[in-house]
Amino acid sequence: MLIDQFGRKINYLRISVTQRCNFRCLYCMPKIPFDYQPKENLLSFEELFLFVKAAIDEGIEKIRITGGEPLLRKDLSIFIKMISDYKSDIDLAITTNGFLLKDFAKDLKNAGLKRLNISLDTLDHKKAKTLAQKDVLDSVLSGIDEALNLDLKVKLNTVALKNLNDDELISLLEFAKSKKAQIRFIEFMENTHAYGKLQGLKRDEIIQILSQKYQIQLIKKDEKAPVSIYKADDYEFGIIDPHSHEFCDSCNRIRLSAEGLLIPCLYFDEALSIKEAVRKGDIKAAVEILQEVLRNKPEKNKWSVVDNETSSRAFYQTGG
């Protein structure tokens, strides 16, 4: 079992398999060029899997594959199968923008993937092109349909932004309901790589908009994640509300970047590398680094909206 110095059980590992993305979303990585790591600096899937096996043996129970856009990483389904074959009951998920999903969903399911989160910020083609700086909507919608047709469990992620998609929150909720998928509205998380003029909606503003049509009822708050679950009449949806709902006291996660950096907190600059250890096949050393990262995991993150602090690490490096 993995326990940090504050007594928190750490059982959730988020793995960014690539920094690359085929979108240029305003809230994440709107400008180019980027400081991508050279390919040789990235851990191979075999190297990542050496660490994943050790992490599972130490107590990791949930793994999420992120990016960048993870479907840009060649042979991702092979990596998924490695993990699934090693521990078939692991809670294994992917977060994707959905653009390539139609082509890869079947392979991912056959490899053992059971669920995924898909970004969907708008149902309007013009807005989608503005947000992603690319004509993406038809491909994303096709990817959603393909995943659902394969009986993969789908959650839709929507970053709620003022003057961009705030007039679509109800229609997005209704779209998700029609697809029998859960939608999760996300408070915009400030970071130094986002377009500077963006303004996000807070939880109460999201609820206020949805309340124009629906009776909104709080069902529960997840004590291990910044998500609150609500009902709009008979439909359950989520709000990921890091501004409004501090969950540091029960945080259960660490992050691994594509180049092998173990990151204790999204809003914490310090990180340690497992690259040398796994490339030598030294699992004992990798586990010792993991334990040191847990000792370094802060009690609270350094993010304060009041103090106008933002993340200096790009989310495309860590998966958000």
UniProtKB/Swiss-Prot annotation:
<dbReference type="Pfam" id="PF04055">
    <property type="entry name" value="Radical_SAM"/>
</dbReference>
<feature type="binding site">
    <location>
        <position position="25"/>
    </location>
    <ligand>
        <name>[4Fe-4S] cluster 1</name>
    </ligand>
</feature>
<feature type="binding site">
    <location>
        <position position="14"/>
    </location>
    <ligand>
        <name>GTP</name>
    </ligand>
</feature>
<feature type="binding site">
    <location>
        <position position="248"/>
    </location>
    <ligand>
        <name>[4Fe-4S] cluster 2</name>
    </ligand>
</feature>
<feature type="binding site">
    <location>
        <position position="189"/>
    </location>
    <ligand>
        <name>S-adenosyl-L-methionine</name>
    </ligand>
</feature>
<dbReference type="InterPro" id="IPR006638">
    <property type="entry name" value="Elp3/MiaA/NifB-like_rSAM"/>
</dbReference>
<comment type="function">
    <text>Catalyzes the cyclization of GTP to (8S)-3',8-cyclo-7,8-dihydroguanosine 5'-triphosphate.</text>
</comment>
<dbReference type="InterPro" id="IPR013483">
    <property type="entry name" value="MoaA"/>
</dbReference>
<dbReference type="Pfam" id="PF13353">
    <property type="entry name" value="Fer4_12"/>
</dbReference>
<dbReference type="GO" id="GO:0061799">
    <property type="term" value="F:cyclic pyranopterin monophosphate synthase activity"/>
</dbReference>
<dbReference type="GO" id="GO:0005525">
    <property type="term" value="F:GTP binding"/>
</dbReference>
<dbReference type="GO" id="GO:1904047">
    <property type="term" value="F:S-adenosyl-L-methionine binding"/>
</dbReference>
<keyword id="KW-0479">Metal-binding</keyword>
<dbReference type="GO" id="GO:0006777">
    <property type="term" value="P:Mo-molybdopterin cofactor biosynthetic process"/>
</dbReference>
<keyword id="KW-0949">S-adenosyl-L-methionine</keyword>
<keyword id="KW-0547">Nucleotide-binding</keyword>
<feature type="binding site">
    <location>
        <position position="68"/>
    </location>
    <ligand>
        <name>S-adenosyl-L-methionine</name>
    </ligand>
</feature>
<dbReference type="InterPro" id="IPR010505">
    <property type="entry name" value="MoaA_twitch"/>
</dbReference>
<comment type="subunit">
    <text>Monomer and homodimer.</text>
</comment>
<keyword id="KW-0342">GTP-binding</keyword>
<dbReference type="InterPro" id="IPR050105">
    <property type="entry name" value="MoCo_biosynth_MoaA/MoaC"/>
</dbReference>
<dbReference type="GO" id="GO:0046872">
    <property type="term" value="F:metal ion binding"/>
</dbReference>
<feature type="binding site">
    <location>
        <begin position="253"/>
        <end position="255"/>
    </location>
    <ligand>
        <name>GTP</name>
    </ligand>
</feature>
<dbReference type="InterPro" id="IPR013785">
    <property type="entry name" value="Aldolase_TIM"/>
</dbReference>
<dbReference type="InterPro" id="IPR000385">
    <property type="entry name" value="MoaA_NifB_PqqE_Fe-S-bd_CS"/>
</dbReference>
<feature type="domain" description="Radical SAM core">
    <location>
        <begin position="5"/>
        <end position="225"/>
    </location>
</feature>
<dbReference type="Pfam" id="PF06463">
    <property type="entry name" value="Mob_synth_C"/>
</dbReference>
<protein>
    <recommendedName>
        <fullName>GTP 3',8-cyclase</fullName>
        <ecNumber>4.1.99.22</ecNumber>
    </recommendedName>
</protein>
<feature type="binding site">
    <location>
        <position position="28"/>
    </location>
    <ligand>
        <name>[4Fe-4S] cluster 1</name>
    </ligand>
</feature>
<feature type="binding site">
    <location>
        <position position="155"/>
    </location>
    <ligand>
        <name>GTP</name>
    </ligand>
</feature>
<feature type="binding site">
    <location>
        <position position="119"/>
    </location>
    <ligand>
        <name>S-adenosyl-L-methionine</name>
    </ligand>
</feature>
<dbReference type="GO" id="GO:0051539">
    <property type="term" value="F:4 iron, 4 sulfur cluster binding"/>
</dbReference>
<feature type="binding site">
    <location>
        <position position="95"/>
    </location>
    <ligand>
        <name>GTP</name>
    </ligand>
</feature>
<feature type="binding site">
    <location>
        <position position="265"/>
    </location>
    <ligand>
        <name>[4Fe-4S] cluster 2</name>
    </ligand>
</feature>
<feature type="binding site">
    <location>
        <position position="64"/>
    </location>
    <ligand>
        <name>GTP</name>
    </ligand>
</feature>
<keyword id="KW-0501">Molybdenum cofactor biosynthesis</keyword>
<feature type="binding site">
    <location>
        <position position="27"/>
    </location>
    <ligand>
        <name>S-adenosyl-L-methionine</name>
    </ligand>
</feature>
<keyword id="KW-0408">Iron</keyword>
<comment type="pathway">
    <text>Cofactor biosynthesis; molybdopterin biosynthesis.</text>
</comment>
<keyword id="KW-0004">4Fe-4S</keyword>
<keyword id="KW-0456">Lyase</keyword>
<feature type="binding site">
    <location>
        <position position="21"/>
    </location>
    <ligand>
        <name>[4Fe-4S] cluster 1</name>
    </ligand>
</feature>
